[in-house]
């Protein structure tokens, strides 16, 4: 059994088409088909369900695919380990992040690249479900996501920060000068919020429900930038995570208002697949994360914006204030 055969199988499972898989592997289709048939013979199991076209993998093939992905991932890890011994970390770190955590990723990737000048980073914006799948299939080295997500499976977790929520509203809004706003009061404003399929929105919906109301925003977006693009016309309000202030800040004509609610929000952090040894690049990012002080950096920035909005007595405390 050759590693090349496993690479062909992984490509076929990804492309779901013999010709496209062959093209992705830079070989002819007959060569790819022959290599996979030889793999079936060597393992003495049917791997591919064949008809007039590719019809998927057999149950045995699915198991072989999992092992192939694992073996190829371990091969990459070995190469990275050896590259470090030869003269420093290099290669490409494959990093995924939920959309609501994207604004803070630079707090990790910038010091990572400054420390490891021969390494590169590819960054994908992914749903928590996609992150789980890509980690399991060894298509990601590490990801930034909610740590309490039940779908994560077997992963190692490194907390980065707790989400804290606040209202962004026009300075002429009826809530702009309040010391605290309730979720019920927020629900009465002209709102733009994240889309319901976003985990962040589902968390917020829970807070609205706990306050006895349902939010019905006029505008919904699946990106943070989509929300912020509506906040310059002095009409719309939204609820944001304090982590977004790092990239977007407080738009002109807007004001931050603390929200009454739980003192502790959901945790966001780094996750990697629970395997040993850890991928070298992922381990290097974890080392950076432990020294980056993301939690403190975000809280310090939050204090600045709260003080600018006149909340000096709330700065340095949790954004959401309990009853």
Report residues per predicted region.
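Secondary-structure junction motif
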Residues: 104, 146, 176, 181-182, ...
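Flexible hinge/capping segments at coil-to-helix
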Residues: 154-191, 282
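C-terminal effector-binding regulatory domain of bacterial HTH transcription factors
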Residues: 242-253, 261-323
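Short beta-strand-centered segments that line the small-molecule binding cleft or hinge
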Residues: 70, 85, 107-113, 122, ...
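N-terminal short secondary-structure element
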Residues: 1-35, 51, 55, 64-65
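N-terminal winged-helix
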Residues: 29-30, 34, 80, 86-116, ...
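Hydrophobic hinge/microswitch elements
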Residues: 127-140, 146, 197-257, 305-307, ...
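A short LG(V/I)-centered, amphipathic sequence patch enriched
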Residues: 40-62
């Amino acid at each position: 059994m050759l590693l090349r055969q496993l690479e062909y199988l992984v490509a076929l499972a990804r492309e779901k088409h013999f010709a496209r898989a062959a093209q992705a592997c830079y070989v002819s289709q007959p060569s790819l088909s022959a290599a996979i048939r030889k793999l079936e013979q060597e393992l003495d199991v049917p791997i591919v369900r064949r008809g007039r076209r590719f019809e998927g993998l057999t149950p045995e093939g699915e198991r072989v695919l999992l092992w192939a992905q694992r073996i190829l991932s371990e091969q990459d890890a070995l190469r990275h380990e050896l590259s470090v011994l030869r003269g420093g970390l290099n290669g490409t770190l494959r990093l995924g992040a939920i959309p609501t955590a994207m604004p803070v990723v630079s707090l990790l990737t910038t010091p990572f690249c400054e420390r490891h000048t021969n390494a590169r980073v590819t960054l994908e914006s992914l749903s928590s479900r996609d992150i789980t799948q890509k980690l399991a299939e060894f298509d990601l080295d590490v990801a930034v996501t909610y740590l309490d997500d039940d779908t994560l499976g077997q992963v190692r977790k490194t907390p980065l920060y707790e989400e804290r929520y606040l209202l962004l509203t026009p300075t002429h809004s009826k809530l702009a000068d309040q010391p605290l706003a309730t979720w019920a009061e927020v629900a009465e404003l002209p709102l733009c919020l994240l889309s319901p399929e976003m985990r962040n929105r589902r968390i917020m919906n829970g807070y609205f429900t706990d306050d006895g109301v349902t939010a019905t925003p006029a505008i919904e977006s699946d990106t943070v930038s989509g929300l912020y693009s509506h906040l310059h016309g002095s009409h719309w309000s939204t609820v944001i995570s304090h982590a977004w202030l790092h990239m977007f800040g407080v738009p002109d004509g807007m004001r931050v208002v603390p929200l009454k609610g739980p003192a502790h929000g959901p945790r966001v952090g780094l996750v990697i697949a629970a395997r040993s040894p850890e991928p070298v690049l992922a381990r290097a990012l974890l080392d950076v994360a432990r020294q980056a002080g993301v939690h403190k950096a975000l809280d310090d920035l939050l204090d600045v914006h709260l003080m600018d909005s006149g909340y000096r007595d709330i700065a340095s405390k949790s954004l959401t204030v309990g009853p």
